[in-house]
């Protein structure tokens, strides 16, 4: 009852208004003083949280009834902000090129915490993605305390994230608001998105909107890719590091005419050789080769109709395990060589169409469709797991901005999954079909208050009827304080193998009941207060922000490595499972072009385990602190970045704790630094990661005999009291970095129109 009261607290009465048509024009201001229209530039209406796109002539129209703050942006250009007073008929926006080094104007950086969004959203901009190497999406969160990144195990190289103290499987991943990285595509999904393909990343905590489905439990991470309308006919990036990692990216955007444009992006990367820094006989990271290609197209009609479509091809092949392992000798007990081979292949296609139903675009209808085929073939020692998944998604959305105060959105969604998966001759295949209807209402009586409430009703072929209410509210009582609250319900179908990939890198058996309920059901609610402080360099924003979020599961699939030393138990939750997360963020520019951002997050995560009761959730970091400093010289010719992390302890699973002689992992620091030199069209950057060289030593238990049980012989260096504790092979308890100090160098070349 309390949850429903929380969701329905803030429904208010309607307010009507009279609108006037406003005309805007966005131009590129050339270094020689000339101008030219910027087609398909984006204009953000801050008070209404609406994104508008200019037409082929750089023009747009908007219905206005009150004072409006409009921000015009275009990839590779500065932004321009215009405050439009009531009665203003038109305004012009002038953007300059970021690489016009003869300009004296310094490029403004986008705030990483938008002030007027109803949901607190952390934005990692293109400039933020360049603060570190960010070879892939998985490596883009090192400056964020909201998201914790680690390895699922010490063998496969699969990176996993945690948000609000829970696995990334409870975070909905979106590609320009299309659900992605679902099912068997999830374990390595973040490694399959090159960082240089991205324009920005938005991190929103909590269940968010009902429009994109029910799977957002702890939050949503949305990726914005480079656009077909980019003014970059050619972008090239190359990268290499001391741990044998290499990467190359090429992107090319072409505007054929006023209607058609496209962008192609190619990625080649991987790890070229094997290394064993801690001398345990296992590769520190797998040898890997990844090929990635995408093509994205845009058609823009004079009527305002837009069609976007594209496709993607992925190939990834990795080999891990003992140093002597090959694909020919690893899957064989007679050789006594433990190896891991994982091959991912994927094909994706999508289609979007948006049709305006009014001249000023206050009403429109859109269809989003997506198809994904993914294959996952693997073995881990003597365990083999092969899977194939076909997924289809369609979302029909009607949107109507009735006036400045009221907006409604409603529609229908279809989600289909055909999953074939075999583990050691056992068939765990399933077929799932879900159809849902949704509605969402937005109330904005002024620029100080926003309420969004939505409902999603779904019929699922596996789980029956599912009902998800969600709501969020923003209130700014004064200009320098913003308060937000949100709450809602989320559901997902557990994928017991790929959600927990690290379990394959053990010598343990799996105990899976025949009647295991795969439905996971949770409520999440929380709030935020942000203070905008009156100090700092001119034209910058100083803020202090406090968050609290609570997550509570009604249903959950529990993966228990502690009940039985020789097995991993799967069972349905019988008791409580919850997390409490507190976070504080502070950002200031004490000097022009010098930014300091500090963040601290504390998590209290509990779960009920059989025979143990309610305990601290294992392998969940209690806290994380991040300090980032960036300084740029005039015109951004030189940029210096430094990041320091303090990673808090995790409770270790029972048997790992006994072997290592410690109940929790140690607190450890991580330091990163990068220097970038910008020339006209070329950026050269050098950097270092894990500067202190901190590593988790002996991360693999029983590495001497991965096919048997070791009673301490030859492994007593892990702890003094472990000599009589049976040690079964287990590489799944990773709490720290596996690689030592790393240096890298890279180059980015951009050809501008």
Describe the role of every protein-language-model region.
Residues 31-33, 39-46, 73-77, 88-130, ...:
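Short, acidic, small-residue-rich periplasmic hinge/interaction motif at the N-terminus
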Residues 544-552, 572-655, 748-750:
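Gram-negative outer-membrane beta-barrel transporters
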Residues 364-378, 476, 484, 518-572, ...:
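Membrane-embedded beta-barrel scaffold of Gram-negative outer-membrane proteins
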Residues 138-179:
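Extracytoplasmic beta-strand/coil segments of soluble accessory domains associated
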Residues 61-63, 178-205, 293:
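Short acidic/polar hinge/loop motifs at secondary-structure boundaries
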Residues 88-94, 137-140, 159-162, 189-194, ...:
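N-terminal periplasmic accessory domains that precede
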Residues 271-292, 298-365, 371-389:
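Flexible loop and strand-edge segments within Gram-negative outer membrane beta-barrel domains
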Residues 4, 646-653, 676-753:
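C-terminal beta-signal and adjacent terminal beta-strands/loops
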């Amino acid at each position: 009852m309390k949850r429903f009261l929380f969701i329905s607290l803030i429904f208010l009465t309607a307010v009507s208004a009279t609108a006037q048509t406003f005309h805007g024009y966005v131009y590129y201001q050339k270094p020689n003083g000339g101008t030219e229209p910027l087609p398909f530039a984006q204009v953000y209406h801050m008070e209404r949280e609406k994104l508008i796109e200019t037409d082929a002539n750089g023009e747009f129209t908007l219905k206005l009834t009150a004072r409006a703050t409009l921000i015009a942006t275009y990839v590779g250009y500065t932004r321009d902000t215009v405050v439009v007073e009531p009665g203003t008929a038109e305004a012009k926006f002038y953007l300059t090129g970021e690489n016009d080094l003869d300009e004296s104007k310094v490029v403004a950086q986008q705030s990483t915490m938008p002030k007027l969004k109803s949901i607190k959203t952390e934005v990692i901009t293109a400039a933020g993605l360049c603060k570190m190497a960010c070879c892939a999406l998985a490596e883009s969160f090192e400056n964020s305390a909201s998201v914790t990144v680690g390895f699922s195990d010490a063998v496969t190289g699969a990176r996993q994230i945690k948000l609000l103290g829970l696995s990334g499987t409870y975070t909905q991943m979106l590609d320009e608001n299309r659900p992605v990285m679902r099912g068997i595509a999830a374990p390595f999904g973040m490694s399959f998105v090159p960082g240089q393909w991205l324009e920005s990343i938005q991190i929103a905590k909590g269940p968010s909107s009902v429009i994109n489905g029910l799977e957002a439990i702890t939050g949503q991470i949305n990726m914005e890719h480079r656009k077909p309308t980019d003014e970059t006919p050619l972008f090239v990036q190359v990268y290499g590091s001391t741990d044998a990692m290499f990467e190359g990216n090429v992107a090319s955007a072409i505007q054929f005419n006023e209607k058609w444009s496209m962008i192609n992006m190619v990625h080649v990367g991987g790890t070229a050789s094997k290394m064993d820094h801690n001398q345990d006989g296992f590769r520190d990271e797998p040898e890997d080769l990844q090929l990635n290609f995408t093509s994205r197209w845009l058609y823009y009609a004079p009527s305002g109709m837009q069609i976007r479509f594209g496709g993607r091809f992925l190939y990834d092949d990795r080999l891990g395990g003992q140093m002597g392992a090959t694909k020919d000798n690893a899957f064989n007990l007679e050789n006594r060589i433990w190896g891991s081979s994982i091959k991912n292949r994927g094909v994706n296609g999508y289609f979007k169409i948006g049709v305006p139903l009014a001249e000023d675009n206050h009403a429109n209808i859109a269809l989003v469709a997506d198809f994904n085929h993914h294959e996952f073939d693997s073995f881990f020692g003597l365990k083999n797991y092969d899977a194939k998944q076909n997924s289809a998604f369609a979302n029909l959305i009607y949107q109507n901005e009735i006036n400045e105060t009221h907006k409604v959105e409603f529609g229908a969604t279809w989600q289909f999954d055909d999953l074939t998966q075999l583990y050691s001759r056992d068939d765990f295949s399933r077929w799932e079909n879900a159809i849902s209807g949704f509605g969402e209402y937005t109330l904005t009586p002024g620029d100080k208050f926003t309420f969004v409430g939505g409902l999603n009703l779904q019929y699922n072929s596996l789980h029956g009827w599912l009902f998800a209410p969600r709501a969020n509210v923003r209130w700014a009582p004064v200009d320098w304080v913003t308060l937000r609250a949100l709450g809602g319900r989320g559901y997902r179908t557990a994928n017991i193998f790929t959600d927990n990939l690290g379990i394959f890198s053990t010598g343990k058996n799996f105990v899976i009941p025949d009647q295991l309920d795969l439905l996971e059901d949770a409520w999440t609610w929380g709030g935020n207060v942000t203070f905008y402080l009156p100090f700092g360099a001119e034209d910058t924003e100083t803020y202090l922000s406090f968050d609290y979020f609570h997550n509570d599961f009604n249903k959950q699939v529990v993966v228990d490595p502690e009940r039985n030393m020789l097995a991993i138990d799967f069972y349905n939750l019988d008791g409580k499972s919850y997390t409490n997360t507190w976070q504080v963020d502070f950002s200031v520019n004490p000097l022009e072009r010098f930014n300091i951002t500090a963040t601290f997050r504390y998590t209290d995560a509990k779960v009920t385990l059989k025979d143990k009761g309610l305990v601290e959730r294992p392998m969940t970091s209690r806290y994380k602190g991040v300090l980032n400093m960036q300084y740029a010289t005039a015109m951004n010719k030189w940029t210096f970045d430094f990041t320091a992390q303090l990673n808090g302890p995790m409770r270790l699973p029972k048997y790992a704790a006994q072997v290592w002689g410690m109940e929790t992992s140690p607190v450890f620091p991580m330091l990163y630094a990068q220097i970038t030199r910008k020339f006209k069209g070329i950026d050269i950057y050098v950097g270092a990661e894990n500067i202190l060289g901190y590593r988790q030593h002996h991360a693999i238990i029983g590495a001497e005999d991965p096919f048997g049980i070791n009673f301490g012989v030859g492994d007593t260096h892990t702890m003094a009291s472990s000599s009589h504790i049976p040690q079964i092979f287990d590489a799944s308890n990773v709490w720290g970095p596996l690689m030592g100090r790393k240096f890298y160098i890279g180059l980015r070349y951009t050809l501008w129109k």
